[in-house]
Every structure is written in structure tokens, then in C-alpha cells.
């Protein structure tokens, strides 16, 4: 299948980077290269773009899309490792970094990847198919209490306890091998009247995907490391697609903007923790009505931006 992905909040994200034509920029989630191409259009031959993705299909697609540009470095890795990636490339500081945390349209539409609850496929959900842990491992090997906590914390699923119990009961008969089997278990666990609120499997699939790819653990460290690698006035722009991610970005930005831990009664700061960033977006930027109509997957997107000081 051709790698297709419509970049969300494209114009807003590029504008937020305040691109310098001879600057160095990092696209932490290269995908099909949509954001990267717009960055490259604004760079001179002295500028440079580093494109990172853990999905080899994404890198292959991006190389084709960006074949007319010579100032691109492709890295097959997880942006969790941005610090060591830049170290290996002998790059000290950069002028801008973007992260688009959404699952690509290709990954959702390619049934064999197991991300979609709309298509029957093997339970996989790995962004990086070289990793060992898959959705199959989570569903068939995790204890009931572990499953419950994942569904509750990562999926904010109100029926997490019941779904976890149904999964464990079903797998005692035979291993649960496909997304279709998992969807049926979820349907049986959630009362019919609550299944009118969108697809019943949406929250569970989100939770399992986050667990498989360690998405939330990765995000906190990646934000800190990214800010440390920015030049003065460099920008970090992050697009999230669900409340858990957005909350992490919001809280981490606030911590980096106002890190002082001194009691309010202290007349001056004595903790020595100085602000690292200035938050550009006091409220997140959301897609326009037109973009939401054109690309339904953009509806939950939020863009938050900060500037290194």
C-alpha cells in the first residue's frame, strides 16, 4: 500500500517554527514527509533538516517525496533518543523541532499493522516493527490488573475493569490473535446503550497502542531533551491527538517555563531553577472548521508551541 498521510495543522505548524533559511530543524515524526517538505521549501542550501521515524515504511515514503532535496538526513530511530541522535550527527544545537504524535493514515489504513478497530488484522500495533512487544503480547500475557490500569489510565475507558476481565476469560479458551476478536470482546463487555458514543473499541485500542509503543513515557523525556538542544529563540512545536498527550505537553511546558520550587512566601528564588522556555500558545491551536471537514482525523488535534530563552 502507498504511504499516505495528510499532515494536520500544516500551515500553523510551519508558521510556528519561525524558520530561518540557514537554520537546522528536526522533524521527530517524519511520516510521509508533509511537514518536512514545507520546512525544506523555506531553507537555503545552507539549511539542514533531520527527519526521524521509527517506521521504515515512513522513511521510504519520505525519501521519495523529498528526493529533490539534498539537505536532508534520514534517521531510523525513536525521537525518544533525540539527544543521542544529534550527538552522533555532531550537531550541538538546532533552531526548531516538531513532533506530530498522531498515527499516520497509512498505519491506520494498512490492515496488517493492527492499529485499526475497523479492519480485522493480527494484533500488532508496533510503530517500530523491530520491537518485541506487540498488542498480542499485551492482550494475551498481561495480568488482569495490569490490563485494567492500562485501559483506565491510557484509554480513560469507563468500562476498563469489565473489558479486562472479559479479555482474560476469553484468552483462557484460546489466545486472542486478531483485532476483530478483540473488538467482539469489547462489544460484549460494554452495555449497548453506551455503544452509541462512537466506536466502542476506540479507547481500548488507544490504550493498547500507547502501552505497546511506550508513547507517554517517551514524550516527557523527549520534550526535555528537545528543549536542551534548542538554540536561543528556537521553537518546539508539538501536535497531540488525545487529552493524555496534550496534558503531558501542557504540564511539561509549564514546568519548563516556571521551574522555581521555592515556597510563595520566599522573597527571592533560592532553588536556582531558571526558566528555559517561553510558552507561545497560552491556549492550543486547533484545526479550522474547513480542515476538520476535509480531514476528519484532524478533529482532536492540538498544537502547542514554546520558545527557548
UniProtKB/Swiss-Prot annotation:
It catalyses: cytidine(1402) in 16S rRNA + S-adenosyl-L-methionine = N(4)-methylcytidine(1402) in 16S rRNA + S-adenosyl-L-homocysteine + H(+). InterPro entries: RsmH, SAM-dep_MeTrfase_MraW_recog, SAM-dependent_MTases_sf. The keyword Methyltransferase applies. HAMAP family: 16SrRNA_methyltr_H. One of its GO terms (cellular component) is cytoplasm. Keywords: Cytoplasm, Methyltransferase, rRNA processing, S-adenosyl-L-methionine, Transferase. Its EC number is 2.1.1.199. Specifically methylates the N4 position of cytidine in position 1402 (C1402) of 16S rRNA. SUPFAM superfamilies: Putative methyltransferase TM0872, insert domain, S-adenosyl-L-methionine-dependent methyltransferases. GO terms for biological process: rRNA base methylation. This is Ribosomal RNA small subunit methyltransferase H. It comes from Clostridium botulinum (strain Hall / ATCC 3502 / NCTC 13319 / Type A). S-adenosyl-L-methionine binds at residues 33-35, 53, 79, 100, 107. It is found in: Cytoplasm. It is an enzyme of class 2 (transferase). Belongs to the methyltransferase superfamily. RsmH family. One of its GO terms (molecular function) is rRNA (cytosine-N4-)-methyltransferase activity.
Amino acid at each position: 500500500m502507498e504511504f499516505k498521510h495528510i499532515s494536520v495543522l500544516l500551515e500553523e505548524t510551519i508558521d510556528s517554527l519561525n524558520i530561518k533559511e540557514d537554520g537546522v530543524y528536526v522533524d521527530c515524526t517524519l511520516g510521509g514527509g508533509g511537514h518536512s517538505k514545507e520546512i525544506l521549501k523555506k531553507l537555503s542550501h545552507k539549511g539542514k533538516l533531520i527527519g526521524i521515524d521509527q517506521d521504515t515504511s515512513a522513511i521510504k515514503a519520505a525519501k521519495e517525496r523529498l528526493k529533490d532535496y539534498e539537505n536532508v538526513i534520514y534517521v531510523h530511530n525513536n525521537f525518544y533518543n533525540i539527544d543521542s541522535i544529534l550527538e552522533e550527527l555532531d550537531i550541538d544545537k538546532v533552531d526548531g523541532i516538531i513532533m506530530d504524535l498522531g498515527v499516520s493514515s497509512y498505519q491506520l489504513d494498512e490492515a496488517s499493522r493492527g492499529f485499526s478497530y475497523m479492519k480485522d488484522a493480527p494484533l500488532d500495533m508496533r510503530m517500530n516493527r523491530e520491537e518485541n512487544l506487540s498488542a498480542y503480547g499485551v492482550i494475551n500475557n498481561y495480568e488482569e490488573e495490569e490490563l485494567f490500569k492500562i485501559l483506565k489510565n491510557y484509554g480513560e475507558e469507563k468500562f476498563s475493569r469489565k473489558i479486562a476481565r472479559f479479555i482474560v476469560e476469553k484468552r483462557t479458551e484460546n489466545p486472542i490473535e486478531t483485532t476483530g476478536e478483540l473488538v467482539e470482546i469489547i462489544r460484549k463487555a460494554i452495555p449497548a446503550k453506551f455503544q452509541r458514543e462512537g466506536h466502542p473499541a476506540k479507547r481500548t485500542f488507544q490504550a493498547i497502542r500507547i502501552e505497546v509503543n511506550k508513547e507517554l513515557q517517551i514524550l516527557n523525556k523527549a520534550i526535555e531533551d528537545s528543549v536542551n538542544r534548542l538554540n536561543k529563540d528556537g521553537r518546539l512545536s508539538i501536535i497531540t491527538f488525545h487529552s493524555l498527550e496534550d496534558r503531558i505537553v501542557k504540564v511539561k511546558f509549564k514546568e519548563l517555563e516556571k521551574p522555581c520550587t521555592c515556597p510563595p512566601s520566599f522573597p527571592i528564588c533560592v532553588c536556582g531553577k531558571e526558566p528555559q522556555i517561553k510558552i507561545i500558545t497560552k491556549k492550543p491551536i486547533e484545526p479550522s472548521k474547513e480542515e476538520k471537514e476535509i480531514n476528519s482525523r484532524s478533529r482532536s488535534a492540538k498544537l502547542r508551541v514554546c520558545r527557548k530563552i
